[in-house]
Regions:
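N-terminal hydrophobic/helix-forming segments and targeting peptides
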Residues: 1-429
Length: 429
C-alpha cells in the first residue's frame, strides 16, 4: 500500500462530518508546526512559518508565509469539506411499528439507493448548556452502527428492480432502536446525545442539549479494492480526497513561496454561506496577508488557484454517458475540467499551465468536458474566481459512483495528485 493511500484512508475514517474533517486537518497542521490564528489582526506573520484559521468548525484556511512579498502572488488550492448525506431534522424522533426512527433531510445531491441496508452511525456538532450555565458546543461521533434503513422486500414490490423511486420524506427514515410492546418510556434523543458527549469529554458531564447538526454516515471504513489493490473505495471521497491532497502538498511545499489551502463548507448546496466559497473568509485572509485592501487587489491579480474537486470517470457499464474524446479513466492521472459556459473556471491559459506542470512533474494528465447534451455540474472554482478575481483552474481526480454513500477512485491517481499539487505550490511551472 502506498503511503499516500494509507494516510488518506486514515483521514477519511477520521472525517465523518465536515466538523470532524476540519478537526483532523487542524490536528495535522498543528503537528507540522502550524500556528492557529484566532483573530487575524492580532498576529504578525513570520517568513517561513505556517498558520491556519477555522470558521464554524467546518471551514479552514492554512498558509505558509513565504520569504518573498505576498503581493508577488500566492499559489492557492481550494477544496470543500462537505459531502452529500442524510442530515437529522430538528425534531426527528418518530415511534411506530415497534421501532424508533429519525426523520432526515437530504443534504446536497445524494444518490439515495445505496443508503439502504447499510450499517449507519451518527456524527456532527452538538450545542448545549454546561454545568456552569454556559452555552458550549462539542463534536460527537458514535463510531458504531446505531441505525439502518431497511429496503422493502421484493415480495412486497415486484417491480422494485425495474421501477422503484424513492420519496425522501417517507422512504429513508432510519431505524434507531426498538420499542417493547408495553414500553411507556419516551425515547429522548437529547439524553442520548448528552450521554455521548459525556462519554467523549470528561469535562462535559450533566449537560443539557439544546440543538445539534448531525448527519448519518456509513460505518464501513475506507478500503483498497481489486486483485491488485489498485482502487480505493470510501465514503466522502468527494471531496475529502482533495482536502487531504491539498494538505499533503502544503506540508511538502517550499517555504520560499507563499502558498495557501482553503477548504470550504457548503459546496454541495451552492456555497452561499458565511463559510462557503461565496462568503468572505478567503478574501478576509488574503487582505490580512497583503496588509491592506489595495495590496490585496495586487496580490489577487498575481495569484493562481486550483479548484480541486472530483471528476467523473468513465463508467465501464455506461461509457456512453461521456464525450468519447474527454472521458477520464481511473489510475490515468488527474483531470483538467473544462466548460465554456463557466461551470468550470478553467481557461485555455490555465489548461496550458497544467499541461506544462504535469509534463515537468512526470504526471499523466487527462481532460474532461461533459457531453454537449447533458448538464454540467460545478465547483467552488467559478464562484471563487468571481468573488476574488483570481485566475482559477478546475482540476480533479477521476471518480466512480460520485455522490453515492461509497465512491471509488484509483490509488495511483492519489499519488499523482499529491505530486502535481506539490509541484504547483513549488512553482515548477
Amino acid at each position: 500500500m502506498s503511503q499516500h493511500c494509507d494516510d488518506l484512508m486514515t483521514f477519511l475514517n477520521e472525517s465523518s462530518s465536515p466538523f470532524h474533517a476540519v478537526s483532523a486537518l487542524a490536528a495535522r497542521l498543528q503537528k507540522a508546526g502550524f500556528t492557529q490564528i484566532k483573530q487575524l489582526d492580532d498576529v504578525v506573520l513570520s517568513p517561513g512559518s505556517g498558520y491556519f484559521v477555522t470558521a464554524n468548525d467546518s471551514s479552514i484556511i492554512a498558509f505558509r508565509a513565504g520569504h518573498g512579498q505576498p503581493t508577488d502572488g500566492l499559489r492557492i488550492i481550494g477544496a470543500h469539506t462537505d459531502s452529500p448525506n442524510l442530515s437529522v431534522k430538528p425534531n426527528p424522533v418518530k415511534k411506530r411499528s415497534g421501532v424508533v426512527q429519525l426523520a432526515v433531510d437530504v443534504y446536497g445531491g445524494a444518490l439515495l439507493n445505496p443508503w439502504f441496508d447499510r450499517d449507519l452511525s451518527l456524527a456532527g456538532r452538538v450545542s448545549f448548556v454546561d454545568q456552569s450555565g454556559q452555552l458550549a458546543s462539542r463534536l460527537i461521533d458514535f463510531r458504531r452502527p446505531i441505525a439502518i434503513i431497511p429496503s422493502l422486500a421484493i415480495h412486497l414490490d415486484r417491480d422494485a428492480n425495474k421501477n422503484r423511486s424513492i420519496n425522501p420524506q417517507t422512504d429513508i427514515l432510519p431505524i434507531l432502536a426498538g420499542l417493547s410492546e408495553d414500553d411507556a418510556t419516551d425515547f429522548d434523543l437529547s439524553v442520548l446525545l448528552a450521554n455521548q458527549i459525556s462519554s467523549e469529554y470528561e469535562d462535559c458531564s450533566d449537560v443539557r442539549v439544546l440543538d445539534f447538526e448531525l448527519s448519518l454516515y456509513d460505518c464501513q471504513d475506507a478500503s483498497l479494492v481489486g486483485l491488485d489493490n489498485s482502487f480505493l473505495a470510501s465514503a466522502r471521497l468527494d471531496n475529502l480526497l482533495s482536502c487531504h491532497a491539498g494538505l499533503q502538498a502544503l506540508l511538502a511545499a517550499s517555504d520560499a513561496y507563499w502558498s495557501l489551502l482553503v477548504c470550504n463548507d457548503h459546496e454541495e448546496v451552492g456555497s452561499a454561506s458565511s463559510v462557503g466559497a461565496q462568503g468572505p473568509m478567503l478574501t478576509d485572509v488574503l487582505e490580512f496577508i497583503a496588509g491592506s485592501a489595495a495590496a490585496s487587489r495586487k496580490l489577487r491579480d498575481q495569484s493562481t488557484m486550483l479548484s480541486v474537486d472530483n471528476a467523473h470517470a468513465v463508467h465501464p457499464n455506461f461509457s456512453d454517458r461521456h464525450d468519447e474524446s474527454h472521458g477520464p479513466i481511473l489510475n490515468r492521472g488527474p483531470v483538467v475540467k473544462i466548460n465554456r459556459n463557466q461551470r468550470y473556471a478553467t481557461s485555455g491559459e490555465g489548461s496550458a499551465l497544467m499541461r506544462l506542470l504535469a509534463e515537468r512533474t512526470g504526471v499523466p494528465l487527462q481532460h474532461f468536458v461533459v457531453r454537449t447534451d447533458l448538464g454540467c455540474g460545478s465547483t467552488i472554482g467559478p464562484i471563487t474566481a468571481a468573488e476574488t478575481g483570481i485566475r482559477t483552474i478546475d482540476l480533479g481526480l477521476p471518480t466512480l459512483a460520485m455522490h453515492s454513500i461509497r465512491e471509488l477512485a484509483g490509488c495511483a491517481d492519489v499519488e499523482y495528485l499529491d505530486r502535481l499539487l506539490t509541484a504547483f505550490y513549488n512553482r515548477v511551472a
